[in-house]
């Protein structure tokens, strides 16, 4: 069996152009060594098997031989990534191929690199397919809802082992360029099959890679070559505009640089982009505005639950200048009547989530106004999912959610199945600790529907979509009311706009 599985993996690598025909013997011997084998018999027939099946079988064999170091998905991932790393071309080969493709077109280069990142199993497509996805038709357009099932949860034994493992400062974080080719351990994911492409943004060395979890099509990450904290400033706007100049078919955005309204990684300067049209991009302008001294920049307030100023021009310098002005003014802006405070006790609250894209020859920059103030009533954030929605979404509203794609926790899959069962059986939802958190939520809409076996799941999906849309409204600094719109215009006027 082991010879057959190794032959299948080598065949896969040849077929996906990770190695050539001339590399077969070399690749086979590398895999034999990793599997602790000295002998090999060439199989008569090598069937075309799915990569997940091949790797799973090799991990089973390795476990029997005591090669994994432990039980569970963490150990299996470390081992099968090592196997794929043995078949992944060296960085200089990958960069050379990318540059060759880029000379034809930026799209051809990214098409190739995205396919390559899936072929190496860096993007585990068979896990990504497990994510639950649907569309909710909100008043703001079609909102994408996903329940993230592709990121494996560590089992308790692996968590305990990681806690007891020696601390290491290398790589400094999961985004550092030093992850390329890293073998990994119980604390850090294996990245032997991971490759990055050097790019220049704002005169600095940055790198392009794809997210292994692919929340949307061609979900890429641009990361600084230097491990430094995220910072929203003029230099970042310039880098974003550089990125969409290099890759005009991609958008690029950055999480905010403050806790609560930022992403999960604030310690490493990075952006996220890709080839996908989010609901926010499709959203119309609710109100046209203009700014003195920037007559060549079209501007407007976007019809969106969060507070968004959209800038558009073929003059990228003017867009960067105006974006810097708006950011600077917002950082120091206080409007107590609208409950906007620049700082409290010396702690800053105002920042921006920026997103850049091309519209033909023009550059477009969306500036989402964010504020991370907390109160006794809202200890996790006033402009953060409120407590009555925590059963669906409690985590930060980062860049991806801001644009209209919900990334909801994996627990919801099980909880919604249990909730459906309870609804159809008439059970007391509040009495079941596994789903009691959803009891008040269900009470609010239960009388609107007739629940049947055929319809209940779709009803729950619709209500999840409705709740996530309300979460986005919570995150909006200025609400979609007359008072909210007037308060936002006060800020626009503060920036010499009208």
Model regions: which residues?
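Active-site microenvironments that recognize anionic phosphate/pyrophosphate groups
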Residues: 1-222, 226-229, 305, 319-323, ...
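Catalytic or ion-translocation cores adjacent to nucleophile or general acid/base/metal-coordination motifs
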Residues: 244-264, 273-334
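Histidine-centered divalent-metal-coordination microenvironment in nucleic-acid enzymes
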Residues: 217-219, 224, 262-278, 368
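Helical scaffold of the NTase/Pol beta-like nucleotidyltransferase catalytic core
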Residues: 193-195, 227-252
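Beta-rich nucleic-acid/ligand-interaction surfaces
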Residues: 259-267, 345-351
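Structured alpha-helical segments in the cores of large, soluble enzyme domains
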Residues: 206-211, 236-244, 290-297
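Hydrophobic faces of well-ordered beta-strands that scaffold small-molecule active sites
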Residues: 208, 252, 269-271
